[in-house]
């Protein structure tokens, strides 16, 4: 499958974000560091929810590394694996690879235990991934498709999918 320019650019952003040590390859330790940094910024260290987030991030890495055939993916290998396992499989790819991470993030953000993300919880999320909190309200309004005042896991997975497909400009996994 040949990726559209926006899709390719978004995956390249993801590669740069996840190459945490800047060595030109994405490794399991990069995903561990990313998960641990998010957990720390959300103040969730030592919780069962933090363990789930770490496991989800490492599960996502493992799927991509298996598709790439390498535990250290260079840019080309990462782009090919992400296209094959996520973009190329459409909703099924996002459900399989991305949804566990979104569910784990919601598990940490969801302070009131309703299984969804409120506007206040969204502010915490944006701050944790290094995005300007001022855009959280605008992003929330755009993503709240059912106008419930809360974001479901489905709405968030769809938003990540739409970002990577170039349908929105809200980088929920960071930039």
PLM regions and their residue ranges:
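The feature marks the first
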Residues: 2-48
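Short helix-capping and inter-helix turn/linker motifs at the boundaries of alpha-helical repeat units
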Residues: 2-6, 51, 96-97, 129-131
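Primarily EF-hand calcium-binding motifs
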Residues: 7-22, 49-75, 99-113, 135-153, ...
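Amphipathic regulatory helices of Ca2+-sensor modules
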Residues: 27-45, 72-89, 116-130, 152-166
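Surface-exposed beta-loop interaction hotspot
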Residues: 81, 91-105
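Short acidic, glycine/proline-enriched loop segments that cap or flank alpha-helices
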Residues: 90-94, 110-113, 127, 131, ...
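Short, charged, intrinsically disordered terminal tails
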Residues: 167-175
């Amino acid at each position: 499958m040949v990726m559209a320019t926006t899709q390719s650019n978004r995956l390249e952003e993801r590669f740069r974000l996840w190459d945490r040590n800047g060595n030109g390859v994405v490794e399991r330790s990069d995903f561990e560091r990313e998960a641990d940094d998010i957990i720390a910024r959300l103040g969730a260290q030592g919780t069962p929810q933090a363990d789930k987030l770490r496991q989800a991030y490492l599960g996502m890495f493992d799927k991509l590394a298996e598709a790439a055939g390498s535990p250290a993916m260079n840019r080309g290998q990462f782009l090919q694996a992400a296209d094959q396992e996520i973009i190329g499989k459409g909703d099924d790819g996002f459900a399989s690879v991305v949804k566990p991470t979104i569910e784990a993030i919601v598990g940490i953000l969801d302070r009131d235990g309703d299984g969804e993300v409120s506007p206040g919880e969204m502010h915490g999320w944006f701050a944790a991934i290094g995005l300007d909190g001022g855009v959280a309200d605008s992003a929330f309004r755009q993503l709240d498709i059912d106008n419930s005042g809360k974001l479901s896991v489905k709405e968030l997975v769809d938003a990540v999918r739409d970002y990577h497909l170039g349908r929105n400009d809200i980088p929920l996994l960071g930039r």
